[in-house]
Amino acid sequence: AYFEAMGLPGLKMLEELLPDMPKDIPVILDAKRGDIGETQKYYAQAYFDRMDVDAVTLNPFMGYDILEPFLDRPGKAVYLLAVTTNPGSVDVEQQVLANGRKVYQLVGDMVTRSIAENSATEVGMVVGLTNANSQILTDLPDAPLLVPGLGAQGGDLSALTGGTRVAPPTINVSRGILYKDPELSFAEKAEKWAKLIREALAL
């Protein structure tokens, strides 16, 4: 969104920036796209073919078919919005259905289905630290998690400790590195957060 806010010059900047990223560092595009299949097909081409990013976030609330154009890409990943960091997560994602399940568990079902169908693309979920808890993690399948909410949003890493999950989480810190502790370099701030994460998760 920050690139799109600048219009075409911003998108050009993004396109020029991506090739400069170190090849051993995965690039996750937080696009949160979710549209009908024909439109999603072109989003998949834009992100995985033209931009060649490693992973993208998707909004799954239109149904499983919005995933399908992204699922034939070996070496790529998608993360489905399950429990996001915003307060409004309780308005939809955490609502209880008539059968007692939560809406976010339907997202988990999509991940389970993609695994059962041997998707070439790895499929995981977005679970924000500000709303995460042991029950949510228990309710969701043991698949990779993209975990925002640490840093500026004040998420608590203890929400990820304990339990029996094996799939690795990818823990994101953005504004906590970009804008906090101006006396430190970006590298120093990144190392500081990496150390906190390692210590909290006993890595």
Language model feature labels by segment:
Residues A31, D35-V126:
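Conserved anion-binding
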Residues A1-R50, N131-Q135:
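N-terminal active-site wall of soluble small-molecule enzyme domains
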Residues G10-L17, Y43, Y47, V107-M110, ...:
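A general structural detector for well-ordered alpha-helical segments in enzyme core domains, enriched
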Residues L14-K23, P69-P74, T138-L140, L160-P168:
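Acidic (Asp/Glu)-rich catalytic clusters
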Residues L160-P168, I177-L203:
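C-terminal helical cap(s) of enzyme catalytic domains, especially alpha/beta-barrels
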Residues A1-Y2, K32-I36, F61, V83-T85, ...:
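Active-site beta-loop-alpha junctions enriched in small/polar residues
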